[in-house]
Amino acid sequence: SGGAGSGKTYSLVQVIKQVLTSNPTVKVACITYTNAAVKEIEERVNHKNLNVSTIHDFLWDNIKHFQKELKESLIALFNDEDVKQLKIDDLTSVPSDYYENREEPVSIQYKEYLKLRDGIISHDELLILSEYMFRKYWKLCDIVKDKYKFIFIDEYQDTHEEVVKILLEYLPRTTKKCIIGFFGDAMQAIYDTGIGDIDAYKGDGKGQVKEVKKVQNRRNPRAVITLANRLRTDGIIQEASGDIT
């Protein structure tokens, strides 16, 4: 964790470079929030074993090939009264063979718009579906951990709760090893849909997130840093870099 101006993105890039230098054969995933951030990190690292993607693209890339499980999961969610976001027209329940009895074969797709009748899911539905599938199908967790030995999340404070559950609750259930790192600042959350902080997962025990605080501010003058410290409520007290007056 680190406040504004502490060099979080620089640290993320340097960590990725060091991991790839020390482990030249492993693949690394970096999840960020915008396509602009994807492009920036790709350009700054430029390594064939690094996969940088948005949250939604990362999730879809890891579940899209499991069409049978996708259809079963969608139907289960359609029929779950607690899941209000997933409904097809006015149907109160959806039969288990809903997608199999269509005149034209249906392949579940992910696009910018939502058309569940034709098997097309959108942003929010993808998050719900992914959380359900990783919770139900443990094999998915092993597949992701076989693919990536390191997963880094940029701007974690804007990451959806469903994604944090996948990474910190479901993936650790299997024995395969994978190191997961979060870079961000709970005080800089932009979107209401983000988890904000991951305090519930912090600690020194096995499987818990160990916090590394970045207290040096490399961007702002001392007066701004002093004011920001008064406003922070998370215990991070920033210090001016040596070359800042």
Describe the function of each predicted region.
Residues 1, 11, 27, 71-155, ...:
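Accessory N-terminal region flanking or inserted into the helicase ATPase core
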Residues 1-69:
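P-loop NTPase Walker
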Residues 15, 40-44, 54-62, 147, ...:
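Alpha-helical scaffold elements adjacent to nucleotide-binding pockets in ATP/GTP-utilizing enzyme cores
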Residues 18-22, 44, 65, 133, ...:
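Active-site catalytic microenvironments for nucleophilic, acid-base chemistry
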Residues 35, 56-57, 138, 218, ...:
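Alpha-helix N-cap/helix-start capping motif
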Residues 50, 150-151, 180-181:
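Hydrophobic "anchor" residues on beta-strands that sit immediately upstream
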Residues 168-244:
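Conserved RecA-like helicase ATPase core segment
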